[in-house]
Design a protein with these regions (language model features):
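Alpha-helical transmembrane segments
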Residues: 164, 305-311, 440-455, 486, ...
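A conserved hydrophobic secondary-structure block that centers on an alpha-helix together
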Residues: 126-200, 287-318
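Long hydrophobic segments that form regular secondary structure
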Residues: 287-318, 325, 387-459, 535-536
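N-terminal alpha-helical transmembrane segments of multi-pass membrane transport
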Residues: 1-106, 150-151, 158-162, 166, ...
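Hydrophobic core segments of alpha-helical transmembrane domains in multi-pass membrane transport
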Residues: 9-22, 71-84, 148-155, 185-194, ...
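P-loop potassium selectivity filter motif centered on the GYG triad
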Residues: 90-134, 198-294, 348-422, 486-535, ...
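Alpha-helical transmembrane segments and their helix-start/interface "positive-inside/aromatic belt" motifs
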Residues: 7, 56-74, 167-185, 311-328, ...
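C-terminal catalytic subdomain
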Residues: 429-433, 438-442, 459-485, 489, ...
Length: 604
């Protein structure tokens, strides 16, 4: 019962914060006054003046798309070079060398696409300058890019017989200055108050409370008896040769809180530490865990209400929100039950306690004892529903069904809230597909929000909906055919295949989380995963802007008795059905070879 209350609390807090934020974002989109305008509008106007931006410019969809691509391309080149040259640049207190070209390519592609896939550990690979000037900046602008494209699509629904969708540069400026900076400033201060580190100190070394012994391979020796004076390690009276006694701990420092905040709110997901928000210095307690977890879905959920207010049809925004929310709740319930019940092998003979949600119960492998099953499962559902990818537990250690649900949430196209901006414009593409199919069934010309849906919009909508499945399946298919990829798997068989499929699902969905048993830092994998991320990010953006441009040029059709309602429960059901059918048809064969095969091998 305590677990149920905990899950309900998380969801209730999310909704309570999303509604007012959605109203605020709508005002920012339209350039209306907000309670922060007196402070922030002068900053906004200063940016326009310095950058010589015409705030009244109206770009057509092609110019808007070119602006997005040029801006992202410049960010890619800058971040790529910053990593290569970090060894000779300042802000490198640990003296770290430049990053290899293939890893630099992968990381640059990852962060400009809002994926934040990390084939490295940040605290031991990247300097403070690279983290702050490279990654954190991209965390802001990649998130803003997704929201800007959504703004353009919303204007496509609003405008009548128009060509312009607004200015990309104005949208980016307003989003960063009025939304992302204020929100993340507040969250950063809360995280610092909760114990997340924020400094520019060099890494420190501290003494352990008691020494530990490790083997020559670096593995901890269990039941070891340590004699510090003689430097001898024994187990059951026998001396362990080549054993090393460890008495000190390396503690990374740095500006973590500021990066963690935008990592969460921008659905970026790339952690300051290698183990992300499972690290006690990045997420030390329940208070910081709650803030970070709610932050994942805060903007994606708020944008649903922004959409409803902007198109002057609040019920439409609520309908889209409910479709996402129902899918999220079902996924959360599935993960929570799977992790609490563990596997038949763990549950047999009372091997683990599965009767409560206390920290020792259920499948606790890969989870932090300070969070337990409930907080870990909720985070797993939130981070894969959004295109975040941040973690507070290791998804590779989840049960087969629990891991499959996290994978499926990404494979659906990251439209169950999804990334900031991109999740909603992806779901709206599914909504267009839904009204078209429904129109065919009843013999009516499909229309959505007063705009007629014709073959042009359908072609682009299908492309937006299928970009993620194509990227994932083609990429993982190529990788599966390369023998050397199998050497990078910590496991064989069904779980090994799941590790590889999860990696490509994560990159294809611009998520960034991973089954940690997959070593992705090779030249081949860095390049192919980078290409998958770029394809899955920018093809839907181009498709969305093409749809927006077409819709803006159409006249508005009056609602009639034959118009399909897109705000009732039936439409919500149809929308969910279309999303699930496309996901199931696309990925069921692959899931059958991975997590489903692993599940049935455990129960039989």
């Amino acid at each position: 019962m305590n677990a149920v209350i905990q899950y309900i609390l998380y969801l209730a807090v999310l909704i309570a914060l999303a509604i007012p934020l959605g109203a605020y974002i709508k005002k920012v989109m339209n350039g209306e006054k907000t309670f922060l305008s007196k402070i922030l509008t002068p900053c906004e106007n200063a940016v326009y003046k310095v950058m010589r931006v015409n705030k009244d410019e109206q770009m057509n969809w092609k110019k808007y798309a070119v602006s997005v691509l040029i801006f992202s391309g410049i960010g890619f080149v800058f971040l790529f070079l910053l990593q290569l040259l970090q060894g000779v640049l300042p802000g490198n207190t640990q003296g770290l060398a430049g990053v290899k070209w293939d890893l630099a390519f992968n990381t640059a592609a990852s962060f400009i696409t809002n994926t934040n896939w990390q084939a490295y550990s940040g605290e031991s690979t990247l300097s403070y300058l690279t983290q702050a000037l490279g990654l954190t900046v991209q965390n802001f602008v990649s998130a803003a890019t997704g929201i800007a494209v959504l703004f353009a699509l919303i204007r496509g629904f609003i405008k009548v017989k128009a060509d312009g969708l607004g200015s990309f540069w104005v949208d980016m400026t307003r989003i960063v200055i009025h939304i992302l900076i204020p929100l993340n400033l507040v969250i950063s201060l809360c995280l610092i108050g909760g114990g997340v580190i924020q400094n520019f100190k060099s890494a420190e070394t501290v003494s352990l409370v008691e020494p530990i012994a490790v083997s020559a391979e670096g593995e901890i020796i269990e039941n070891a008896e340590i004699d510090l004076e003689k430097n001898i390690v024994t187990v059951n009276g026998e001396t362990v040769e080549d054993a090393e006694i460890v008495t000190e701990q390396f503690v990374p420092m740095g500006p973590a809180a500021s990066q963690v905040a935008i990592k969460q709110t921008g659905t970026n997901g790339g952690g300051y530490m290698g183990v992300n928000s499972a690290h006690p210095l990045e997420n030390p307690n329940g208070f910081t865990n709650l803030i970070e977890m709610i932050s994942i879905l805060l903007i994606p959920a708020a944008l649903c209400f922004t959409f409803g207010k902007a198109v002057k049809n609040k019920k439409q925004g609520v309908a889209i929100f409910m479709a996402m929310f129902i899918c999220l709740a079902l996924a959360l319930g599935s993960i929570a039950v799977s992790e609490q019940l563990a596997t038949p092998q763990l549950a047999q003979d009372g091997m683990v306690d599965i009767s409560t949600v206390e920290q020792a119960g259920g499948n606790m492998e890969g989870k932090e004892s300070r969070f337990g099953i409930a907080s870990s499962s909720t985070w797993a559902a939130f981070t894969t529903a959004a295109s975040s990818g941040s973690v507070n537990s290791m998804h590779d250690s989840y049960t087969p069904l629990g891991g499959m649900v996290t994978m499926l949430l990404m494979q659906l196209g990251e439209v169950i809230f999804g990334g900031v901006g991109c999740g909603l414009y992806g779901m709206l593409a599914f909504a267009i597909l839904t009204v078209f199919i429904a129109g065919l069934m009843v013999g009516r010309t499909p229309e959505f929000l007063g705009k007629k849906i014709e073959p042009y919009e359908m072609k682009w909508s299908v492309l937006v909906c299928l970009a993620t499945p194509i990227a994932i399946l083609v990429g993982s298919g190529i990788a599966a055919a390369v023998p050397s990829v199998a050497d990078n798997l910590n496991n064989t068989g069904a779980h090994g295949f799941s590790e590889m499929l999860y990696a490509f699902s994560s990159c294809g969905a611009n998520n960034g989380s991973a089954f940690a048993g997959f070593n992705a830092n090779t030249v081949f994998l860095n390049i192919i995963l980078g290409l998958v991320m770029l394809f899955a990010r920018f093809l839907p953006i181009i498709g969305t802007l093409a749809i927006a441009g077409s819709l803006a040029g159409k006249k508005r059709i009056a609602t009639s008795a034959g118009t399909l309602s897109t705000t009732n429960g039936m439409f919500v059901f149809l929308l969910i059905l279309i999303v699930l059918i496309i996901g199931a048809l696309s990925f069921f064969p692959a899931l059958a070879l991975g997590p489903l095969a692993e599940f049935f091998s455990n129960v039989m």
